[in-house]
Amino acid sequence: TPGGIATQGTFTFIPQPPTITSFIPTSAGAGTTVTITGTNFAGVSVVSFGGVNATSFTVISPTQINAVVAAGGASGSVRVTALGGTIMTPGFAFIPPPTVSSFLPTSAGTGTVVTINGTGFTGATAVSFGGVPAAAFTVVSGTQITATVAAGASGNVQVTTPGGSGTIAGFTYLPGPGIIGFAPTSAAQGATVVITGTNFTGVSAVSFGGTPAMSYMVISPTQINAVVGAGATGDVSVTTMGGTVLSPGFT
């Protein structure tokens, strides 16, 4: 007033309590960013999923928070603590990372189907051998996957799901055999043919024109001596754990 200023008491601002209207995704694994929408996200101090504090969070606006799910999480409520109080909304499902316990065979070539055992395989999005994606894979169950080896490399077997990745060491990639040449190129039953090439390890079959050799001896990874059976004109074939190779021209 013209006579001065009178005051009484103090003014206290009481912030409105936060609310959560939604969060996406509702199911997530460690490292996933969840977008939480709601109101009154001022002075946020805690964000948690299933009682486990988020690894980190960013308040984008008073109506949005982006929070990263922590490892070792749990299913349950999404919780936000702000200046106005705490809000908890149920419905979050934590997806644990998969584990890989074993696989067979442990050595394989291109096209071989490998059976992988473990846990948490539901919803698998990728399988790799030595860092090379599988040519194809099928989730048989939450504990088993069958995967086809692509042209790859030795190393870890890895399974990836929305919950993360699980790996196990010990896979050996077997390159397919190759035939450089064979002599003689024409031979009768009982004759020995010398086949030269590459990757003649673990040979399981040799044939001439589709007829299995009477016998064969792997001299080295680059040479096979094979005895012609009652054969036919056609391809010379060598099969190993890494695959089968055909070379035409035998009569």
Per-range role (PLM):
Residues 1-251:
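Ser/Thr/Pro-rich low-complexity tracts
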